[in-house]
Amino acid sequence: MSVKTQTITVLPGDHVGTEIVNEPTKVLKAIEAPTPYQKIQFDFKHHLIGGAAIDATGVPLPDDALESAKSSDAVLLGAVGGPKWGTGTVRPEQGLLKIRKELNLYANIRPCNFASDSLLELSPLKAEVVKGTNLIIVRELVGGIYFGERQEQEESEDHQTAWYRPKYTVDEVTRITRMAAFMALQHNPPLPIWSLDKANVLASSRLWRKTVDKVISEEFPALSVQHQLIDSAAMILIQNPTKLSGIIITSNMFGDIISDEASVIPGSLGLLPSASLASLPDTNTAFGLYEPCHGSAPDLPANKVNPIATILSAASMLRLALDCVKETEALEEAVKQVLDSGIRTADLRGTSSTTEVGDAIAETVTKILKQNT
């Protein structure tokens, strides 16, 4: 059996980020054992990012971390930020924005579903409202207002003005539309596509809508796309989330907001993974950065954070970047079994610690893989 070595750059980041990256690396080490599919080895390279990097080097993304990421098969990130670093000139979040831009991670993929039906009762919405919710948000990640021209208050002549310009090009919208279409076509039948914008107000949204229509009609005629204003979609997501089941495609800022809104539907931010991709995963080898949806949670006690979002991010990495589809399925099943067994952290009304949940998932995925040998 041949050995495939995958190099993973690990960027713990700040606060709980330093804890949660230990659990997926533990689980991936468990998967290293021979399986009926292939022999895998992981080579983990740890580097600083965010506030920890600022404290150590003065910058939120040191050159060695960026170079390691560029030379790796994938990047696993914890979380960045915290009140210690405030909103000063040098901020932890700048490291995240820079690595996205430098690695051309133009598409952020965030699912919103229930890892197990046993979690339905934990949703802040009624179980009968959220049951069956299964949507994937495809967010454009390196364009729009976050990367547009800007003027800070202190840069204006009267010190009373600050602005950003939300800008999109046809090429930027075209490639994110193709990503959404690819994701839709991975299902049989293909999933519907919802495009969220503010075309009744913003010129950039009108270009967005026109381009999405053109790409879908000319390149993917078998797919359907419906347009929804972002404010209306935000209401629908709470009133009737299953209506938006399918693929949601939207711009950088709108995606930032709507994906966070969607992330609370399953009951905890600690459940949902995220992948930021630099290319279509059409050969299951798309380079990307994988991270949980939640932030650095600086107020959370040690060993109390839910590691499942980060572990499922590693599962996405196995599927999309490393061509380990069977291992991904085994890991997702292991997460479901552990949740159903009642081994849960406090955010899921459990009493288990971060490491206990990680240990249980590592042990369970090992058993599942051995059963298939």
UniProtKB/Swiss-Prot annotation:
Q: Does the keyword Isomerase apply?
A: no
Biological processes, Gene Ontology terms: L-leucine biosynthetic process
Please list the GO terms describing molecular function: 3-isopropylmalate dehydrogenase activity; magnesium ion binding; NAD binding
**Which residues bind substrate per the record?**
R100, R110, R139, D231
Q: Name one Pfam family in it.
A: Iso_dh
Cofactor, free-text remark: Binds 1 Mg(2+) or Mn(2+) ion per subunit.
Annotated Gene Ontology cellular components are: cytosol
> What positions does the entry give for NAD(+) binding?
82-93, 295-306
Where does the UniProt annotation locate this protein? Cytoplasm
* Record keywords, A-Z: Amino-acid biosynthesis, Branched-chain amino acid biosynthesis, Cytoplasm, Leucine biosynthesis, Magnesium, Manganese, Metal-binding, NAD, Oxidoreductase
Q: Where does the chain bind Mg(2+)?
A: D231, D256, D260
Q: Which PROSITE patterns match?
A: IDH_IMDH
What this protein needs as a cofactor is:
Mg(2+); Mn(2+)
* Record's catalysed reaction(s): (2R,3S)-3-isopropylmalate + NAD(+) = 4-methyl-2-oxopentanoate + CO2 + NADH
Name the top EC class. oxidoreductase
InterPro entries assigned: IsoCit/isopropylmalate_DH_CS, IsoPropMal-DH-like_dom, Isopropylmalate_DH
What Enzyme Commission number(s) appear in the record? 1.1.1.85
- KW Metal-binding (keyword) present: yes
Instruction: Please indicate which superkingdom the organism of origin belongs to.
Output: Eukaryota
Q: Name the pathway.
A: Amino-acid biosynthesis; L-leucine biosynthesis; L-leucine from 3-methyl-2-oxobutanoate: step 3/4
Q: Where is this site: Important for catalysis?
A: Y146, K198
Q: What is the role of this chain? A: Catalyzes the oxidation of 3-carboxy-2-hydroxy-4-methylpentanoate (3-isopropylmalate) to 3-carboxy-4-methyl-2-oxopentanoate. The product decarboxylates to 4-methyl-2 oxopentanoate.
Query: What family does the database annotate?
Result: Belongs to the isocitrate and isopropylmalate dehydrogenases family.
Describe, as the record does, how this protein assembles with itself and its partners: Homodimer.
This chain belongs to the protein called: 3-isopropylmalate dehydrogenase
- Please name the taxonomic classification of the source: Eukaryota, Fungi, Dikarya, Ascomycota, Saccharomycotina
Q: What gene does this protein come from?
A: LEU2
